[in-house]
Amino acid sequence: MVADELKEVVVPPEEATFWLDRWGYWCNAHGRFQHKKIIDYFHAAIARDEKGYFVGQVNGDCREKVYFRYEDTALFVFDVLLDDRPTLVLNTRQHIPLDPDALFIHNDYLYMRQDGHLIKFNERSMLKISALFEHDGDTCLITIGGERKAIRDRDAAASSEDGERHSNP
């Protein structure tokens, strides 16, 4: 059957029985998922369309899309490949180049924006990428290929712009 001919079953986020917590763990009413194969499958099945992020699969003659809730973002950096040009390994298994100009800090966490996606570094990836960091007073710098760049602190920038602290990255 051609993919365009598949019947589509859509579950809205308010009816989904699972979600991503702010650390990138899949959860349901009983707590965090425990089975690695299921966790990996869910992460690899994340996609996005105009309605938001969903976990998708083809099951027989149906394309299933379950839009899910997430506490912070749906995309996380799970690993960093430290080469001349570092590569980020996302929870979806996608590999993307690190863009130092797209990095920012918010609430003591490192994020990167790419193509309209907000990507958060989890604790493991933060530890790994910290080998590239330097601190110069209040500024966090990242060195890639001999070039040092300042990482924006979104909280400080927002605070200096309008006197308010913003909670959403």
Go through the PLM ranges and name each one:
Residues 1-169:
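Terminal leader/tail segments of proteins
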